[in-house]
Amino acid sequence: MRKNRKSISKRHQSKARPGPSQQAFDDICFIELEALKEHEEIRPDYLEQLKNEILSDGILKMPIAVDKNTYIILDGHHLLHALKKIGCKRIPVILFDYQSPEIEVIPWREDENITKEMIVQTALAGRRMPPKTSRHMILIKGELKHISILEKDINIPLDKLK
């Protein structure tokens, strides 16, 4: 694993969540897994590790980030696939306005270029980019933060998602 990547456990711990300067997101709601649109492939090793952690906990700790207009996943591809493997039918999401200027996308790798338009076109066409191609950021008090900073702890029992 690369140094700058958080372990699964650390990613699911509580975080300070300062609010964005404008309303770029909505509260948590539940969406059927099949309604969501993906734009990235997943890493099978990470998927299996995440699935096992969720099963061990017996709860889902965090929602995923989704565009409210297209249902494109902004953050949470691996979580979606883990829940599918577990047999869940729906998932808690935070809906974001992907067109908001507060939301930006940057590549994980320096030698790549990625735009919101590329992500939307890829997802709507049913195609996938390589794993960890995009990193969705949100402007909070003049500073770009990873969108997961707004993903609240929810601790929902898995049977509520089946």
Task: Identify what each model region corresponds to.
Residues 2-69, 74, 80-162:
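Short, charged/polar connector segments at secondary-structure boundaries
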